[in-house]
């Protein structure tokens, strides 16, 4: 919407092309997750391919009315959610994409969390193409421990990880390998390689929130 476009103009520089919006649904998107940019950026990139996001029930509790209107799919963490699988199949059957963040939580240090093989099993079960989207720089924009947003470039890499022709032949292990490979990131290395300067008064403000005595 208008707010999203304004945010990605003034708060962060999102670098992307039309690759994702040109892929014909239904398909499943898996992406790394460091913050709001990964969600808002995904909406911007999908354009008219209106997708449904899989989120945890704990997030539903924060803004239940708003989130339900957005058409999200709620997931109970650390369990096999049969109802969720039915809902995902329903959305795909309507010719819409489904977006999953397989790390299940925000990155704490600007590198990936563990991606479990269960997501690869789900992709195999759904029998639709798999698209990976990697965000580089969204952790730098706002680390998990910081309340301050920093203006910086966020680059996106979109890949069709598994095609419609491959999905029936490829193994779960190979699907998992491709997901992990395509979503591997290191935001501080990205900052170093691209000579990104982040100039704010208190660069470490909020870091004490994750320190323990």
Name the predicted role of every residue range.
Residues 141-143, 197-200:
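Glycine-rich, charged/polar anion/phosphate-binding loops
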Residues 131, 180, 207-210:
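Unusually extended, aromatic-enriched hydrophobic runs near protein termini
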Residues 5-170, 174:
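Soluble catalytic domains of membrane acyltransferases
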Residues 173-194:
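Short, structured interface segments
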Residues 198-212:
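Short, flexible, mixed-charge glycine/proline-rich loop motifs
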């Amino acid at each position: 919407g208008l707010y999203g476009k304004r945010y990605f103009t003034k708060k962060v520089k999102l670098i992307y092309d039309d690759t994702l919006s040109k892929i014909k649904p239904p398909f499943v998107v898996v992406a790394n997750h460091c913050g709001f940019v990964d969600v808002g950026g995904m909406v911007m990139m999908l354009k008219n391919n209106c997708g449904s996001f899989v989120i945890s029930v704990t997030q539903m509790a924060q803004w239940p009315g708003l989130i339900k209107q957005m058409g999200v799919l709620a997931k109970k963490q650390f369990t096999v959610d049969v109802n969720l699988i039915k809902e995902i199949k329903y959305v795909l059957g309507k010719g819409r994409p489904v977006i999953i963040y397989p790390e299940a939580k925000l990155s704490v240090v600007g590198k990936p969390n563990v991606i479990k093989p269960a997501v690869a099993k789900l992709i195999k079960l759904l029998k639709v193409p798999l698209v990976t989207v990697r965000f580089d720089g969204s952790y730098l924009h706002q680390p998990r421990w910081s309340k301050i947003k920093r203006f910086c470039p966020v680059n996106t890499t979109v890949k069709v990880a598994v095609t419609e022709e491959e999905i029936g032949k490829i193994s779960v292990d190979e699907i998992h390998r491709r997901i992990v490979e395509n979503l591997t990131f290191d935001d501080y290395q990205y900052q170093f390689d691209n000579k990104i300067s982040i100039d704010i008064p208190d660069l470490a403000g909020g870091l004490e929130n994750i320190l323990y005595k």
